[in-house]
Amino acid sequence: MLFRSMHNDAYAGASHGPDVGFIVPVFHEDALIAFATTTAHHLDIGALTPGSCGIVDAIDAYAEGLQFKAIKVYEQGQKVVPVWHLLRDNIRVSDLVVGDMEAQIAAARFGAEQLGELINRYGLTTFAAACGAVMNYAERLMRQAIAALPDGRYSATTYIDGYLDDPDPARRNLPLVVTINVEGDEMTVDLTGTTPQVSDRPINMPLEGTVDIAIWLTVRSVLLDTDTHGHIPVHDGLVRPIHISAPKGCLADPVFPAPTIARFCPGNQLADTVMKALAEVAPQQVSAGI
């Protein structure tokens, strides 16, 4: 655990700027085995306005606060002091925020230590086999659930608020379009037809970290509901049969530096739209909304 990194890049898997992740590597006999990570929503990240979600005037990603692309905050077991100076000098209520960040690192370190002890106890071979088995198990469950649906294409559209005072109706109501293609034990969720990105409002949804999560969550909740199927491990294996595509530059796959801090608002509507599409083929399994 010689280094620890910080990451909040919305265009590289993080959800949005205030959700900061701290990553601690897990080594076994000098080989990198895994990462232990904590993520927390922080009170401030040095954005245009105070707070963490009310940045409605953000016209680009730079106005949404400091951006960290997996930068090291510890190196060789020691703090990278300039990074911590940068945090304290550019974040409001920095004592509180930086203290929370230190707590995150401590939690991630604890997780890394516990995982290391687990590997030492059972051995790397057994650990790797168990990881593969649990991922394959979840994949089988999802494939079985998808295969139980009739092959076909199922679509739905939802409109979200855009520029409400604009004379052009196409800019007042922005479509989110979902087409689900079921073929055998695999599913493709296509977002073609979704409105283009909004370059000066923070409602864009990065494909990785927002759109994919909204889709995976909804499909899992419909096809493998916990009340019906019991506990199902949630990880990469579960979503292997689900493929997602979206036109580059649309609201669901924006191009940097389009602002994204309010991505959860259209993200919830996207999840509802996936639910509506699945209602065509699994009406008894959907809810009234997310």
Predicted regions and their residues:
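Short, small-residue-biased leader/transition segments that mark boundaries at the very start
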Residues: 1-2
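Structured core elements
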Residues: 5-6, 23-25, 34-37, 67, ...
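Short, small/polar residue-rich loop motifs at catalytic or cofactor-binding pockets
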Residues: 18-21
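Mobile "lid/hinge" segments at catalytic clefts and subdomain interfaces of large enzymes
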Residues: 27-116, 274, 278-282, 286
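Short acidic (Asp/Glu) and glycine-rich catalytic loops that position anionic groups and cofactors
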Residues: 85-93, 110-123, 188-198, 247-256
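Accessory "access/gating" subregions that flank catalytic or transport cores
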Residues: 113-196
